[in-house]
């Protein structure tokens, strides 16, 4: 009992102290015109900005950008390739800008390219007739397989070779990304109804949390086909911002 009485005495002294010193101070601050803001200190907006920046940085560290098929045989008309994507050349600047933003944010950049045997034996059956004479599209070591002018693989980036439409088909891409803890994908390149679309559908099937296609950093042979493919991908939960919307 004596200990309980001592505790009660201490609490009583504390309450009286608050009444004598703190309450008059708060009353004075309130009456001075500051209201609640005068009593409760403002948290600097920089604090919230810092928290948002930290959250964004954490998200970017779990994000990969896939740059798909931005090779000369697909996007450079001067090559005369039978697989030229008519809208490909126009999006080269947007792809370059998207890659620059990704690198600045610390996003892992993967360059997905086709490189085929000169014989064409590793290409889809319906395209093998293009490889007579060992000079088919994107043959390994030939100029057509190079990245478009203005696009470069830099230290820290990753190059992935595929021989089919999807970047995930018969490659180790999913293994690499999951090992690195990647959860989100941002996709740019060509072309929308084929390699972009199949890669996206495989990514969704593989349970990547967020899959995003930058609509003006991707292209197809025709604008209507591009837009139709974008609409289809939106129906399965794929995000489709423009480059400007994504970079904000």
Ranges and model annotations:
Residues 71-77:
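Short acidic, Gly/Ser-rich segments with clustered Asp/Glu that frequently serve as metal-coordination loops
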Residues 70, 114, 216:
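Active-site loop/turn elements of alpha/beta-hydrolase fold enzymes
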Residues 64-70:
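N-terminal nucleotide-binding beta1-loop-alpha1 segment
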Residues 2-64, 97-105, 128-248:
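Active-site-adjacent betaalpha module
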Residues 109, 113-132:
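Early exported N-terminus immediately downstream of N-terminal targeting peptides
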Residues 61, 79-102, 106-114:
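A short alpha/beta connector and helix-capping loop motif
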Residues 73, 117, 220:
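Active-site loop signature of alpha/beta-hydrolase-fold enzymes
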């Amino acid at each position: 009992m004596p200990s309980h009485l001592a505790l009660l005495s201490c609490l009583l002294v504390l309450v009286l102290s608050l009444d004598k010193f703190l309450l008059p101070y708060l009353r004075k601050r309130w009456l001075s015109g500051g209201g609640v803001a005068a009593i409760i200190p403002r948290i600097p907006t920089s604090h919230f900005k810092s928290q948002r920046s930290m959250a964004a940085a954490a998200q970017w560290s779990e994000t990969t950008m896939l740059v798909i098929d931005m090779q000369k045989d697909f996007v450079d008309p001067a090559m005369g390739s039978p697989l030229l994507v008519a809208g490909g050349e126009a999006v080269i600047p947007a792809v370059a800008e998207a890659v620059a933003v990704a690198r600045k944010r610390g996003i892992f950049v993967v360059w997905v390219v086709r490189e085929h045997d000169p014989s064409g034996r590793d290409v889809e059956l319906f395209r093998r007739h293009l490889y007579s004479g060992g000079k088919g599209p994107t043959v390994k070591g030939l100029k057509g397989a190079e990245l478009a002018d203005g696009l470069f693989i830099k230290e820290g980036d990753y190059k992935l070779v595929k021989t089919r439409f999807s970047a995930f088909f018969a490659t180790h891409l999913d293994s690499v990304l999951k090992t690195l803890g990647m959860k989100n994908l941002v996709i740019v390149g060509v072309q929308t109804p084929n390699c972009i679309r199949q890669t996206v559908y495989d990514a969704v099937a593989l349970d990547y949390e967020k899959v995003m296609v930058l609509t003006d950093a991707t292209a197809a042979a025709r604008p209507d086909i591009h837009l139709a493919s974008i609409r289809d991908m939106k129906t399965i939960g794929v995000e489709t911002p423009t480059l400007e919307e994504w970079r904000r």
